[in-house]
Amino acid sequence: MADKITSRSEDYSQWYIDLVRSAKLADYADVRGCMDIRPNGYAIWEKMQAALDRMFKETGHVNAYFPLFIPESFIAKEAEHIEGFAPECAVVTHGGGEELAEKLYIRPTSETIIWSSYKKWIQSYRDLPILINQWANVVRWEMRTRLFLRTTEFLWQEGHTAHANPEESQEEVLRMINVYKTFAEEYMAMPVIMGKKTDNEKFAGAVDTWCIEAMMQDSKALQAGTSHNLGQNFAKAFDCQFQTKDGVLDYVWATSWGVSTRLIGALIMAHSDDRGLVLPPKLATRQVVIIPILRGDKAAVIERANALAQELNKNGIPSFVDSSEQNSPGWKFAEYELQGIPIRIELGPRDIEKGICIAARRDTLEKTELALDETLPDQISEILNTIQESMFERALQFRTEHTFEVQSYEEFKVAVEKGFVIAHWDGTAETEAKIKAETKATIRVLPEEADYIAQYRIDEPGTCIYSGKPAARKVVFAKAY
C-alpha cells in the first residue's frame, strides 16, 4: 500500500526503494548485489523488449546468442577494454572440481567473445554487414548497488555490428542512438538529450560513444542508452580482416550499442509519485482496472463490469476486473494507484442506471464521467493517448525548469545542485576531472540535436567557466546516477 512509501520530499532515495518493493517490481536477492525481478517488474521489461526488438528488426537486425564465459586471453587482447572493465569482472577459476587451465570471465559485455566468432565468419565484403543483437544477462561487480539502477547482475540487450567501411559503421551508430531516443520519448514518455560522451566518459575501447541522457525528478541525470563507434579496434585485436571489393585486405569496422533493465529505474524516477508507480500506457501490461462498487444487486454489477472488460480487451485495451470482496473499494483504489494502472474505472449500481461510469487517470488522479455505450472503447483510447502525451510534456517541462545556463564557476556550483547546467568547457580532460572532484558533477553529454543546440546556443564560443580558457562550445553538466 502507498502508506509504506516514504515521500520524495522527505528522502528521495528511500522513496525509490520503498516504491520498487511495495509495487512488487523487484526485491533484494540473497546473493550479494543481486535482485529478484518480480512479475510486475518483469512485465515492464517484456513490454520494453517487445518494442525494442520490433524496432531492431525494422532496422535490419537479427537476434543471436553467445557464451556467458569469456576466456581470459580474449579479454586481454583489447588493452583499453580490459583496463576499463577489469575491476568489475567476476572470474571463474574452477570447474568440474578442478582448477581451470585458463580463467573464464563472466561477461561484463560481449565484444571480445563475439569478435572471436566474427573473425571466423567474415572473409569477404560479401559477408558484411553483420547486424546482430543479443538479449542476455551480464555481471559487473558493483560495490554500491540499487535496485534496477546498479546491480551485480542485470538484463540487457547488446547489439554488435560489423561493416566494410567507417561511413557505414558511423551510420549504424547514429541509427541506433536514434532508435533509443525514439523509444525513450515515444514509449517511456521520457525526454532525452542525444549527443556524444567526452573521451573520459566514453566506452572502454571505443573511438566515440553516443548517448541519451534523461533527467530524473531529483534533477539528477541518468544515462539511458549508449551507441559506440568501435572503429577497427576490436577487429585488429582479433585479426578480423576481410577482402574488399578491390581485392585488398582491410580490418572490419565495428559498433556496439545497448540498454538494460536500468530503464525500469529511469521510468520509475522520471514519472512516479508518492502514491506509487506511474506508468505510460504504452509500457503498461494492464491499462485499465475496473472496480465494481458492490451495493444492491452485486451480481448484476459484476456482470456489467466483466462485459465492459471484455469489450475493452476486444478493442485492444488490456483490462481486468477486481470484484473481490475481502478488500474495500478504497483499498483497491490505493493498491492500483501503487501498481501504476493508467486508468481506473469505477462502476456501481447507480452508474449503471444512469448509463455512465467514472474513469480516473493515474497520472493526474483526474476523474471523468463516461457514457456506457459503444463509444466507450474510443473514449478510453483517447484518454490513454492523452496520458502518454501529458507524461512526456510534464517531464519535458520539468527538465526545462531545472536546466540552467551559467557564465561563472560560482554560478555553476549553485546551479548544479538544482539540475542540469549548460556551460562553456575548454575541452580538456584536466578541467573535466577538476570540476568532477570539486562538485561531483560530470559532463553528461556534448549535445548533437539541432533543436537543443539552437535552444541553448550550444555552438556559441565563449570562455570556460573553470579555467578561463577559450571554449569552442557549451556542454551539459549534472550530477548523475
UniProtKB/Swiss-Prot annotation:
Coiled coil: none annotated. It is found in: Cytoplasm. It catalyses: tRNA(Pro) + L-proline + ATP = L-prolyl-tRNA(Pro) + AMP + diphosphate. Its EC number is 6.1.1.15. Keywords: Aminoacyl-tRNA synthetase, ATP-binding, Cytoplasm, Ligase, Nucleotide-binding, Protein biosynthesis. Pfam families: HGTP_anticodon, ProRS-C_1, tRNA-synt_2b. Its main location: cytoplasm. GO terms for biological process: prolyl-tRNA aminoacylation. CDD domains: ProRS_anticodon_zinc, ProRS_core_arch_euk. One of its GO terms (molecular function) is proline-tRNA ligase activity. Consists of three domains: the N-terminal catalytic domain, the anticodon-binding domain and the C-terminal extension. Belongs to the class-II aminoacyl-tRNA synthetase family. ProS type 3 subfamily. Homodimer. This is Proline--tRNA ligase. The lineage of its organism: Bacteria, Pseudomonadati, Chlorobiota, Chlorobiia, Chlorobiales.
